[in-house]
């Protein structure tokens, strides 16, 4: 399955469900309490993050999609913190604030990137919450997908009225289910239980074949459009009536924290479907997004650039010819892994042994080598009529095939100052007998603390000489 980045900016989504605040107390631990055999944490940072349905909305907004949220909170500072965080992220939130009942808060005590303790502040909402019919109707008018984010905390008690209202308007409904009765999600377009939640409903599955059979039966029983079972390290399984099962392997490189991974899955699915992607492609994107978010600590969202970079890696564009946006994402990813970026540029009209040796030496100055290539018009201006011999596409393709070269990009100007200002390499390399101050762009690179190096050229290796020899013969 070939993945591509959707137009999330044209994909409005409404989330309705159980909102909560994820609060983190960070601190150091250096001793055991004299009162009990437990560590003493000296708290030096308090951090609030939207959780539950609020995290789903936050993830949707982080991808660049317009997000709206309806939920239930108390009338307290936790609700204010949630509202402020969501507003800062661009999420439109409508809260039903209930007096004398606390906003749900999950407090985690953290030390050295480890969770030592979780404390929950919550009381299930016993009243008939979400009596926000007018607000729901109003917000449904402008969205392309409705998400029901159900954590079983009492905010969602009218599943069917929401599902039917959305279906009447032709709006797909995605539900992240909870509890022992999935009939409340009857008629949904897609539900996304994890394996444990799924087996609570259908019974234990001995193998994949049994999972598929029981899942297909559940689709029929509940009139569901599709079922996506998330299976942790075993990936995901998508089931649709009349279609073969689609199994996707897990994509995580490293797993630090699975908190909120399900939120990331349904938010990416919702945004992708709202953007017009078909379900298999949306599931592929959600699987990729989940692999990113479990590599983060705590409840977290992934951004559009992070997802775009993961798609590039998945589709094999980790190396080769890139556009500027792709290149900047690739550089961000490399720097996140403490890799040094080297930059060189030239026409590279007829690639010869001198070029190859020079590029190998340039690559040795760091971890990643960018080769910026003059486009055809700029080569003609620099070298005169009849040049280039090879088009820019062919020149870049040959350069991209060299083991020393990571990324190749073209530029239209005669010199690469504009590109250097955006790329900001750690090392600028040029071949020849220049002084460092004579290297074009040296002032830019040195201005932000980068390094400029001049490498000697291989003798008797010149594109111009090769061209003249060909012409004479």
From Swiss-Prot:
**Ribokinase: annotated segments:** 1-317
For this chain's UniProt record, which GO biological process terms are given? ADP-L-glycero-beta-D-manno-heptose biosynthetic process
EC number(s) on file: 2.7.1.167, 2.7.7.70
Q: Which Pfam families match?
A: CTP_transf_like, PfkB
Identify the catalytic residues.
Answer: 263
A GO molecular-function annotation: ATP binding
Binding annotation for ATP: 194-197
**InterPro entries xrefs:** Bifunc_HldE, Carboh/pur_kinase_PfkB_CS, Cyt_trans-like, PfkB_dom, RfaE_dom_I, RfaE_dom_II, Ribokinase-like, Rossmann-like_a/b/a_fold
GO cellular component: a single term: cytosol
Q: Pathway listed for it?
A: Nucleotide-sugar biosynthesis; ADP-L-glycero-beta-D-manno-heptose biosynthesis; ADP-L-glycero-beta-D-manno-heptose from D-glycero-beta-D-manno-heptose 7-phosphate: step 1/4; Nucleotide-sugar biosynthesis; ADP-L-glycero-beta-D-manno-heptose biosynthesis; ADP-L-glycero-beta-D-manno-heptose from D-glycero-beta-D-manno-heptose 7-phosphate: step 3/4
Q: What does this protein do?
A: Catalyzes the ADP transfer from ATP to D-glycero-beta-D-manno-heptose 1-phosphate, yielding ADP-D-glycero-beta-D-manno-heptose.
Q: Which family does it belong to?
A: In the N-terminal section; belongs to the carbohydrate kinase PfkB family. In the C-terminal section; belongs to the cytidylyltransferase family.
| Assembly description | Homodimer.
- What is the protein name given in its UniProt record? Bifunctional protein HldE
Species of origin reads: Pseudomonas putida (strain W619)
Q: Which gene encodes it?
A: hldE
